[in-house]
């Protein structure tokens, strides 16, 4: 068996899971860098209690759940129907399905292969490293002897970028804007200062896409969303850019592969109330045919590259 596991943070599928998501996220040492486990757990509890009601209210505006799980499951289902060489499934970091239950579904031995596929085009210790560490620890814990490979850092992949360009131009044909905003999930500046590769990868990716799209837009803007707390984060903020922009714009969520609360609610709803300009949002790759083509191409000629922090 060749088992491909997509890795993501996950999205709450009901209002109760909002608390589960927050608790697990802020207990992640790559997210909340407090070395003392007990102190980190206490601080995580405080943050969770402070934020859970607001998160639940936001989720109510999306119908009470994130679309991430359903879209990822649809992607797996389509890929499993499209071919029979690989079996596709997915694991979330902070809400079900967790690594333990997914790995227990399969009987794996030394002749089998597990391909870990974090659904993040750019590397960060807060996403890719954290996800891979959890999976590799669980594989060891369950004494699984299968060979393990990793797909990591795919923002330079030509198929992937052709897909993005196609999706952007398709949206532009229906909403003619001369400004394209690349919105990436922000990170605290302190994480970048410790050597995290994320900002460099995002900047590189924007330059690649600008070159491909330079004849279609007059202006490109890179901005960062989802800032949390009083510390310094990567800037400029997407919300600030929209609040000060006069002309129509398109937004592409460059750091996301699957639509989630950050795209559907934050970019699609919340920022509409802050924006000075008219804008439209381009969907993530999700379960599109082009994304499936890229995935199958990647696992057949692996782009695997180990990156440590």
Curated annotation (Swiss-Prot):
Gene Ontology cellular-component terms listed: cytoplasm
Pfam families attached to this UniProt entry: Ferrochelatase
Family matches, as PROSITE patterns: FERROCHELATASE
Recorded metabolic or biological pathway in which this protein acts: Porphyrin-containing compound metabolism; protoheme biosynthesis; protoheme from protoporphyrin-IX: step 1/1
Organism domain of life: Bacteria
Principal EC category: lyase
Signal peptide: none
Keywords: Cytoplasm, Heme biosynthesis, Iron, Lyase, Metal-binding, Porphyrin biosynthesis
Subcellular location: Cytoplasm
InterPro entries, alphabetized: Ferrochelatase (IPR001015), Ferrochelatase_AS (IPR019772), Ferrochelatase_C (IPR033644), Ferrochelatase_N (IPR033659)
Sequence positions that bind Fe cation: 185, 262
Main location: cytoplasm
Catalysed reaction equations from the record: heme b + 2 H(+) = protoporphyrin IX + Fe(2+)
EC annotation from Swiss-Prot or TrEMBL: 4.98.1.1
Entry function: Catalyzes the ferrous insertion into protoporphyrin IX.
Family stated for the protein in its record: Belongs to the ferrochelatase family.
UniProt name for this protein: Ferrochelatase
Record gene name: hemH
